[in-house]
UniProtKB/Swiss-Prot annotation:
Gene name tied to this protein: proB
Protein name as annotated: Glutamate 5-kinase
Family: Belongs to the glutamate 5-kinase family.
EC number: 2.7.2.11
PROSITE patterns cross-referenced by the UniProt entry: GLUTAMATE_5_KINASE
Chain positions recorded as substrate binding sites: S54, D141, N157
Subcellular location: Cytoplasm
Length: 276
């Protein structure tokens, strides 16, 4: 199945706050620049690319010199407003160095749930892609209250990236995180932790292996990534979870190399291949 990834034409790349930011709250410019180069080169190769990027609140905290993520809704939305503007400025700068035009698309759950507005989003994304533009999608944190409280089914950008992948009928969703893939135990505490190379069904046993929430500036944990993977598999789409510290790993994935965990449903008897 990995070999078939070479033929993927339309890609959705999701990058999380933990990949865009250092643990000390500063922006990881090196990673962002590499990401811009990789995605621009995929465009040069003839691929269609959509970037789903978190980071508005994390970048906003950095811009406003906040060491702790705010907890009140008005403060979170204010920080997101500043951060989203700064984030797009950074992306535009780095993508511009490679001659790649980007466009901002901010979504909320009601927009993707309502048929007419959902179709408008699909048409807009298709129009951007047809013009060779890389859409940069984020949830509109400035108005999306429920996501900021972590109580909605929309969840965070992990699930949003899966929804976007379905909307544009992407061939592959690549989720860049701060972990190499899905493990049977926490690799940070268990040196013998085993990574799944492929998962064909999200079972209760798989869910039980997932831990809690993610970084202090982000919202996602392994459970949200499993929810996104489940959404993709229900839509007969593929998702790969891998480490985003070096975005050039995307090139290796597109060559069919065994990197990260591939989530893909199979009709035959389920099996979980592992890498040791």
């Amino acid at each position: 199945m990995r070999e078939s990834l070479k033929n993927s034409k339309r890609l959705v790349i999701k990058v999380g706050t933990s990949t865009l930011m250092y643990g000390n709250g500063h922006i990881n410019l090196r990673t962002i620049e590499k990401l811009a180069m990789v995605l621009s080169d995929l465009r040069n190769e003839g691929k269609e690319v959509i970037l789903v990027s978190s980071g508005a609140i994390g970048v906003g905290c950095h811009k406003l010199q906040l060491s702790v993520r705010p907890t009140s809704i008005p403060d979170l939305q204010a920080v997101a407003s500043v951060g989203q503007s700064e984030l797009m400025h950074i992306y535009s700068k780095f993508f511009g160095e490679y001659g790649q035009v980007v466009g901002q698309v901010l979504l909320t759950r009601d927009v993707t749930d309502f048929p007419i507005s959902r179709e408008n989003v699909m048409n807009t994304l298709d129009s951007l892609l047809s013009r060779g533009i890389i859409p940069i999608v984020n949830e509109n944190d400035t108005v999306a209250v429920e996501e900021l409280e972590h109580v909605t089914k929309y969840g965070d950008n992990d699930l949003l990236s899966a929804i976007v992948a379905k909307l544009v009928q992407a061939d592959l969703l690549i989720m860049l995180s701060d972990i190499d893939g899905f493990y049977g135990s926490n690799p940070a505490t268990d040196p013998e932790a085993v990574m799944f190379s492929e998962i064909n069904q999200i079972t209760p046993e798989i869910e039980a292996l997932a831990g809690g929430r993610g970084s202090k500036f982000g919202t996602g944990g392994m459970l949200t990534k499993l929810s996104a993977a489940s959404y993709c598999m229900d839509s007969n789409q593929k998702m790969i979870l891998t480490n985003g510290k070096n975005p050039t790993v995307i090139f290796n994935i597109m060559q069919g190399e065994q990197i990260g965990t591939l989530f893909a449903s199979k009709k035959e008897e389920l099996s979980h291949d592992r890498t040791h």
